[in-house]
From Swiss-Prot:
Keywords: Endoplasmic reticulum, Membrane, Transmembrane
Recorded GO CC terms: endoplasmic reticulum membrane
Cellular localisation: Endoplasmic reticulum membrane
Listed pathway(s): Protein modification; protein glycosylation
Family stated for the protein in its record: Belongs to the OST1 family.
Lipid bilayer topology: Single-pass type I membrane protein
Subunit structure: Component of the oligosaccharyltransferase (OST) complex.
Purpose of the protein: Subunit of the oligosaccharyl transferase (OST) complex that catalyzes the initial transfer of a defined glycan (Glc(3)Man(9)GlcNAc(2) in eukaryotes) from the lipid carrier dolichol-pyrophosphate to an asparagine residue within an Asn-X-Ser/Thr consensus motif in nascent polypeptide chains, the first step in protein N-glycosylation. N-glycosylation occurs cotranslationally and the complex associates with the Sec61 complex at the channel-forming translocon complex that mediates protein translocation across the endoplasmic reticulum (ER). All subunits are required for a maximal enzyme activity.
Name of the protein in its database record: Dolichyl-diphosphooligosaccharide--protein glycosyltransferase subunit 1
């Protein structure tokens, strides 16, 4: 589930659109 975190720009290419990307999940 943390695969998208390794991506430089997960917001552009989110592996988990259901979560809304790691920015929504972490909030960063």
């Amino acid at each position: 589930v943390f695969t998208h975190v390794l991506q430089p720009y997960p917001e552009i290419r989110p592996r988990f659109p259901l979560v809304g990307g790691w920015k929504t999940h972490y909030x960063v």
